[in-house]
Amino acid sequence: MSEANVNTKKEKGARKTRTGIVVSDKMNKTIVVELEDRKQHALYGKIMRTNKKVKAHDENETAGIGDRVLIAETRPLSKDKHFRLVEIVEKAK
């Protein structure tokens, strides 16, 4: 083994951040965020929207229904929770 291989640190990849709308806040310290993804159809060129709901950890329970939030990928916190709340971008009116 060479010295260079022994002393190098394994770097972590960048964590994914997504913006979405809170659709439920009824669980303790958990919010459900709907993420929208837009893709162009390969052949016809039409913009197609797909929605996905993910659970995110909200430690202080500050987010409410209708808020636009920024969530970041994290280690698995439970069976379904793999995101955490970073900030509330816009409060619901």
Swiss-Prot record:
Checking Gene3D superfamilies in the record gives: Nucleic acid-binding proteins
> What PROSITE patterns does UniProt report for this protein, alphabetically?
RIBOSOMAL_S17
Q: Alphabetically list the UniProt keywords.
A: Ribonucleoprotein, Ribosomal protein, RNA-binding, rRNA-binding
Q: What GO MF annotations does this protein's record show?
A: rRNA binding; structural constituent of ribosome
The processes (GO biological process) annotated in the record are: translation
Entry keyword Ribonucleoprotein: yes
- Offer a single GO CC term for the protein: cytosolic small ribosomal subunit
The record's annotation in InterPro entries points to: NA-bd_OB-fold (IPR012340), Ribosomal_uS17 (IPR000266), Ribosomal_uS17_bact/chlr (IPR019984), Ribosomal_uS17_CS (IPR019979)
Record bears the keyword rRNA-binding: yes
Entry similarity comment: Belongs to the universal ribosomal protein uS17 family.
Q: Which NCBIfam families does the protein's record reference? A: PRK05610.1 (NF004123), uS17_bact (TIGR03635)
Tell me how this protein assembles. Answer: Part of the 30S ribosomal subunit.
Describe the function of this protein.
Answer: One of the primary rRNA binding proteins, it binds specifically to the 5'-end of 16S ribosomal RNA.
Q: What is this protein called?
A: Small ribosomal subunit protein uS17
**Naturally occurring in which organism (per UniProt):** Corynebacterium aurimucosum (strain ATCC 700975 / DSM 44827 / CIP 107346 / CN-1)
The gene from which this protein is expressed is: rpsQ
